[in-house]
From Swiss-Prot:
Chain residues that bind [4Fe-4S] cluster: 24, 110, 208
Domain of life (superkingdom): Bacteria
Name used for this protein in its record: 4-hydroxy-3-methylbut-2-enyl diphosphate reductase
Ligand binding (isopentenyl diphosphate): 55, 88, 138, 236-238, 279
Originating organism: Ehrlichia ruminantium (strain Gardel)
Cofactor note: Binds 1 [4Fe-4S] cluster per subunit.
Amino acid sequence: MHNAIYTGLQKEVEVILATPRGFCAGVSRAIEIVKLAIEYYKDTKTIYVLHEIVHNKYIVETLKTMGVIFIDKVDQAQDGSVLIYSAHGVSKSIKQLAELRDLEVIDATCPLVNKVHKEVQLYDKSGYQVILIGHKGHREVEGTVGQISTPVIIVQNLNDIDKIEIFDPDKLAYVTQTTLSVDDTKVIIDKLKKKFPNIKGPDLKDICYATQNRQTTTKRLAELVDIVFILGSKNSSNSNRLKELAAIQTQAFLIDSYKEIDLNLLNDITKIGITAGASAPDILVQQVIDFLKQHMKVKLSDLEIVQESVTFNVPRQLRQYKEQYNPI
C-alpha cells in the first residue's frame, strides 16, 4: 500500500512520539515469563500458551519462531508439558481442567487483572450481584466472568443498563475491564450510580494505570498533529480505545506495522503523531520512523505527559532462574 504514487521525498514533517507508549508492566511480565520458560525448560518440555499471550501479532509470531505453541483449549496441551495462561487471565473452570492434567502450569495473568478477579470473588462471597463493565467476548472479560459460578451481568454501553434485571438494589456491585476508555466508563458508572444509588464499586480504579496514561497522552497528541498512527493489533482492546480517542480530534489509524501506511494520506500533512498500545513492542514504532525517513525529512520530538516506573515480578517458580538468566 505504501509504495503507491507518492512523490514527496523532500517533504518536511514533524513526528511527535507519545510517551508513555507501548509495553505496560503486565505485558512486559507476561512476555518475560514465556521467554524465561523457553530457556528454563529448553529441550525438556514443550511450552504451550493458552490463547495469545498478549494481543499483538508481532509478539505472537516472534514467540512461535522460538518454539512456543499457542492453543485455544487446555486439552490441546500434551501431558508432561508446560502450560502458560495469557496476560488476560482465565476462568476458574479452565484452572480446574488444567489441575486434572499432568501439566506444569505458569500463570502470566496481569496482577491488575487478578485484582479485579479478587474483587468479583469478594463481592460474590458477600452476597452481591456483580456487574462487569466490559466487552463481551474479550479474553479478559471471559476470565473475569468465570471467577464465580453466579451469573455476572455484562454492561457494554449505556443502553445495557436499562435492561439490567437485579435481585436487590442494596446488594449490587460493579467492576470493570482493565483496558476500557476512561471517559466512556465514567459515563457508564455515573448512570449505574444514578439508577442504583447504593451500588458498590471501584469507580475508575480497575482501569489500569497504563491504559489511563496512554489515553491521556494520546488525547493530547491528537490535538497537536494532523494524523495519528497507533501501533497495535486489531484485537487489542486498549489499542482500539487509543484509536477511538485520537479519532475525536484528527485522522487516526490502528496499524500492525509500517507496511499498512499509505503515504498518499500524508500529502498535506506536516505533523504526524505516533503512539503504541500496551502490547505493542517499540521496535514497531522504530520501523515506522525508519520508513517515514526513507520518504521525507523527519524532525523527531517527544510528548511526555507522565513517567512510568511500575514493574511486576515473575511467578516464584521462575524467579530464581531469572537471577541467573536475562531474557532476550
